[in-house]
Every structure is written in structure tokens, then in C-alpha cells.
Amino acid sequence: MGECPLRTANVAGGGTRNRDWWPNTLKLNILRQHTEATNPYDPNFDYAEAFKSLDYEGLKKDLRALMTDSQEYWPADFGHYGGLFVRMAWHSAGTYRVMDGRGGGGQGQQRFAPLNSWPDNVSLDKARRLLWPIKQKYGNKISWADLMLLTGNVALEDMGFKTFGFAGGRPDTWEADESTYWGGETTWLGNEVRYSSGNEGHKESGVIDGSESKKGHKDIHTRDLEKPVSAAHMGLIYVNPEGPDGIPDPVAAARDIRTTFSRMAMNDEETVALIAGGHTVGKTHGAAPSDNVGPEPEAAPIENQGLGWSNKHGSGKGPDTITSGLEVIWTKEPAKFTMNYLEYLFKYEWELTKSPAGANQWVAKNAEEFIPDAFDPSKKHKPRMLTTDLSLRFDPEYEKISRRFLENPEQFKDAFARAWFKLLHRDMGPRSRWLGPEVPKETLLWEDPIPTPDHPIIDGSDVDSLKKAILATGVAPSKLIQTAWASASTFRGGDKRGGANGARIRLEPQNKWEVNNPQQLAEVLKALEGVKADFEKSGKKVSIADLIVLAGVAAVEQAAGVPVPFTPGRGDATQEQTDVESFTHLEPAADAFRNYGKGTSRVTTEQIMVDRAQQLTLTAPELTVLVGGLRVLGANYDGSSHGVWTDKPGKLTNDFFVTLLDPYTSWKSVDGEVFEGTNSKSGKKLTGTRADLVFGSHSELRALAEVYGSADGQQKFTKDFVAAWDKVMNLDRFDVRRGIYDETRLKSKL
């Protein structure tokens, strides 16, 4: 029954669906995720407050006890679960991609499909099951997202490693995240979409030594991985440990590693530290061929209760475990953090061999058998390595770093501690979200640090006077709105980066982005700097970040004729606090809100629009009202008239929707991106883009447009636009949500 196609079920959710009839239609489902409808906790539940009541040290004590409390249903290798839990944490956080900010461990998504069933995550279902008694004990005070990562941290500590710290604060989600593009392949280990000459992979469940993945590319030394994915195969976290497509070539593997880890925001030193540090402990598992392994959790029968990959080889566990298909124990003390990994890497010469499952791996030449067995104390093994381990020796740059680490153990330990901390926290966002007694004091550049204002926050009367001063500068309100939007809309809900706080729009690289209209941006910033200077003559201070947002608020208020909320307290980042290379990934290729850019051969403009809206955590109604409002406010990045369908530009009217829904207007394509409209009744000519016309062509978006385009729609349109505007302006204000600022400071007279 579990394998029957959904469309054969004649109950709700079954049958042929819209996506079957029209697979290319614009999907809005990613704008309806992670809402109160799916969250079992009360609407007023605050995870941050619950975490603060957690017995943190008691939890860590319980986790340390678990490390050596081997369970019969899933015995611990070497009597210690450390290696398993390090892998669990690594594979939770390691899905992060800097290009779009998605993935990572911040939502606890390893519990859900597809991640819970990826070939690279075989046996991690058992790791989470081992954790359940502890999760059960502490309940809502610790999320799965936090617990999985903290467990990896505690595992390292219990094996003798000093970590850099840990921050909690990751609330759980309750459904599979549909917003992340993991690749276009439809088979496990396939990569024919992410690479132009890739392989189709295989449909069977199981481990990563699938035969289809070993056909190999003709261009493994030159191929380019599509953006924004970071893994070399569908269903892998990183790269194929046997080598590119199973070809045991350490140099070619290094190329894949460098691509993948750089897309995780890791440089070469961090990459070497993570691989060497992570492979210092634990082992891989490949006791027998993968045809012994049953279906993954999502395809397993109901009686398996969420567990997958049942193994018919021997006992199916312990010494008979099949996970990756590789059988490697790196060091002589796999439950202790040592320098053995790097020592052996350079001490021995390595020859290619096969695991019991038939996977490519390497064994030390002329070495004695001194590596312990995971379960039989009478057995010993020769040192073994993965192809990707040897990359750290045979890639010239990785080799330099690896040798330096070998010669400087304390440097290696510090590098691994920092890289591991970064891996676990890269998608956490601002430090104001970080919770717990182990938050490190040192500020790190990748945090995108923003100084906390060292002066009293402006009050209501200050806000009123500043708004008047801003509007008196003579800068067009549309330019003020464009600048405020440009600053705030860089926010990414995936990794909580970007946003108006910090005013990085005035710094490189954002001040050079075409979408930000650099010449106009400089004009607006100059005017606001003047307002700031005049205001501070009184002895008070205001951040330019606050002024940028306040300028937009003042302009929207003037256009709408109603008060617009404003929450002060932003700080100003410096260029030295800004990682230029990292921030380049926030530059939009297209921004429908400002009618900038266009689609590609694979992605339409409107698909990019929905993707951007999801990053801004917008609902479909919020997306609709913002686009319609920004058009009539003249927020197009280049001042074009596309979609500015109003006789009162600069006024917050519902004219965009009224005009769009006029049945007398017919449209013709100019180039597939821009369209010309003619009203047969008035003769009026219009122009619009795909980002405009989609609100009339897409049935669900049109339904929303009809609400705002109705005769009684103006009041609701204004109310909803102001609310959505305020939401975007404050997406990165986790400091306010956490009550770090005194509430009395925020009750400005607006």
C-alpha cells in the first residue's frame, strides 16, 4: 500500500493533482509553510523563553552519559556514540548554502523528507531515536534543531576536544521545507542536472556506493556545479567520498571538495580543519553490499515506525552495519580526539582497495594491523582512508595547510574549533538570537556584526522632527522608498542575513549593485547624512540605519495619509565588519518588487519573485499588496513606468489592481518579459513586465488582486500594505522581538 502512487487514492489529497496537469505553473506553496496551522504549540509559545528555563548543564550531563550508554537496538562503535553524533550534527548543519542562505541546521529539517531519507543520512534515524528519551525529558525547552547540534558538540567534548562554544535559539519547524532546491535529479546519487554530463544515479534506496554513480564524468577535472546547490550528487551532503562519481582520484576529488565547501562559506583552511577534525573520530560502515539494505524511512513500511534502511546482513547492526558502504577506521583511538588522522595521512603511502561492500577506499601500504575493531577487541586492522581524505595530501593547497596543522597541533585544534562552531551556527543570524551560557564572547566576521547603539534611542518627538527634516531635503519620496526597501529587502529568512540593521547598503558591495541604482543611492545617503549631522548638533544621536528606514516610513506616510509604524534602535556597521565576498551572494539577479532583472532559460521572472518573497517570509497576500503598492509609489529601480498604472503616482492607491483587472485591456508580448497593453475603451497604452501581469494571469494571485481592486478595496489595501511594509522593515530586528530594548523606547508618538 505504501508504494502505491498518490493519485490512485480516492480520498482527500489523492487523485490527479494540478501539478500533474500543469507542472510548470507558478507554485505558491512555499509561501504557506511553517505557519500556526502546522505548529502544535500555542500561538504565544516563545521558544527563546522556554530555552532560558532549560537546565542546560543537566542536559549536557545527560548527553555525556548517553555517549557510553550503548543500546542493544543500535550498539555504539567502540562503546561510544561520539562519532555517530558528530556525523548527525555535521549532516544537519552541513546542508547550508551561502548562495541562497537555505539549508543548515536551524530548522531541524533532518527529521523530515527528503533529508531524513538521503543516502548520505543512512543510520542517522537511529541517532535521533537514541536521543528521544532525552528530548522527551526536556520537552519544549530544547528543540530538535538545537538538540541535534548540541549533541554533536557534547560528543566532541566527551572525546577530549575543547569546543569554541555553543548557542541555542533554533525553534523547530513541523513540516518538510519545500523552498530549498536540492537539485533537479529524480534518482539517488544522480547528478545529470547539476553537471552537464552527469549520471542518472539509481532508484533503489540504500547507501552511496550505487553502481550508477561510478560511471564517471569525462570532465571531472573541469566540470562546473550548477548554482545554488553545493553537493555533488542528489542525496549527498557534500561530495562522493569514493571520489568524483566513484572515481578514486584524490586530486579531482579536491576540486569537488573546494567547490562544495566554498558554497558552505568555508575557505581552504576551514575545509581542511573540518575534514581532518571530523574524521579524527568514529568510523564509516560498509560491512556488506548495499543490496542488503531496505528502503529509506519515507518508503519503509508503517511498522518500522519511521526507521529505514533495514539491514538483512547478519544482525543488521554493530559489526554488520551498512551505512555508506565504506569501511574505514581512521585512527587507533576512534573515541578520542588526537592528531592521529593527520599523522597517518602523511606517514603512510596508500594503495587502492575495496570495502566489503565493493566501494573504493585506501589502505596503508606495509602497515601493521593496529587499528582497533569497533566491536571485537581481538581484531585489528590496517589504517584506511577515503579518497577525499587523500585529497588533503595530494591537493597542493590542502597539503600545505594539512602539514602546517600536523606540525602545529594547537593551531589545528583552534582552527577546527572555530570551523566547527561556524558550521553549526552559520545560519543562526544575528547574535541577538544566540542563547545559552556557552555563547562565545569573541565576535566573528561571518556573524555580520552590527554595533549596538551606544547612545539613547530616539524617542517619539525625535522621530517626528526627523521625519519633517527628511521630507524637507527635497529628495523625491519615491527615492526614499526605494532606498528603504533596498536596504531592508536584502533579508534572507534562511540564514537570517541581510536586512536594514547595519545600514550596509551604504557599504561595499551593496552600494555598487545595479539594482540599488548607485547614483541615486548616493544622492539619498548624502541627504540623510545631512539630516543626521543637523540632528546631532543637539547632542543626541541617530544611526543612519534608522534614518534610512525612517525616510521610507515618512514617504509612505505621506503617500498613504495614515500613520506607519517605526521601531528605532538600529546600529551602523562598518566596512571592516562586512565580508564583501560573502555579501555578494545577497545581490539579487532579479527583484520583482522593484521591477529589476528577468528570468533565465530555466527560471521565470515570476518564479524568482515567489522565491524572493519566501526569503522575506511573506505570505501570498503580502507579496501581492507590496508589489501593487510599490508600483504606484514609483519604486521601480530605474524609474521606469512599467506597472505604474495610476494617474496619481506617489499616492498609495489601489490603481495597480484596478487597472490590471480592467477587462477592456488586452496585452501583447514585446519580448517575453515586457508587455504592451491597450485599453479598447479609452485607448490608453500601458507597459508591464511578467512581474506585473502575473497578478492577473495566475488564478490564485488574481483572486488576491481582486480583493484589493474592488470598489471597497482601498482601505484594506492601505492597511495591508502598511503592515507588510513594517514587517519587511523589521525582519532582522530580533533584538526587538527578544525584548533587548526597553519597550518604553519603542512607543514613539507616530
From Swiss-Prot:
Record-linked Pfam families: peroxidase
InterPro entries in the cross-refs: Catalase_peroxidase (IPR000763), Haem_peroxidase (IPR002016), Haem_peroxidase_sf (IPR010255), Peroxidases_AS (IPR019794), Peroxidases_heam-ligand_BS (IPR019793)
Cofactor note as given: Binds 1 heme b (iron(II)-protoporphyrin IX) group per monomer.
Biased composition (Basic and acidic residues): 200-218
Transition state stabilizer (site feature) positions: R87
Subcellular location: Cytoplasm
Known cofactor(s): heme b
Binding site for heme b: H279
EC number(s) stated in the UniProt entry for this protein: 1.11.1.21
CDD domains, A to Z: catalase_peroxidase_1 (cd00649), catalase_peroxidase_2 (cd08200)
Protein's name in the database: Catalase-peroxidase 1
Coiled coil regions, renumbered to chain: none
Posttranslational modification: Formation of the three residue Trp-Tyr-Met cross-link is important for the catalase, but not the peroxidase activity of the enzyme.
Activity response to pH changes: Optimum pH is 6.0 for the catalase reaction.
Tryptophyl-tyrosyl-methioninium (Tyr-Met) (with W-90) crosslink residues: Y238-M264
Region (Disordered): 199-218
Catalytic activity: H2O2 + AH2 = A + 2 H2O; 2 H2O2 = O2 + 2 H2O
Family matches, as Gene3D superfamilies: 1.10.520.10, Peroxidase, domain 2
Species: Pyricularia oryzae (strain 70-15 / ATCC MYA-4617 / FGSC 8958)
Subunit text: Homodimer or homotetramer. Predominantly homodimeric.
PROSITE patterns for the chain: PEROXIDASE_1, PEROXIDASE_2, PEROXIDASE_4
Record family assignment: Belongs to the peroxidase family. Peroxidase/catalase subfamily.
GO terms for biological process, alphabetical: cellular response to hydrogen peroxide; hydrogen peroxide catabolic process
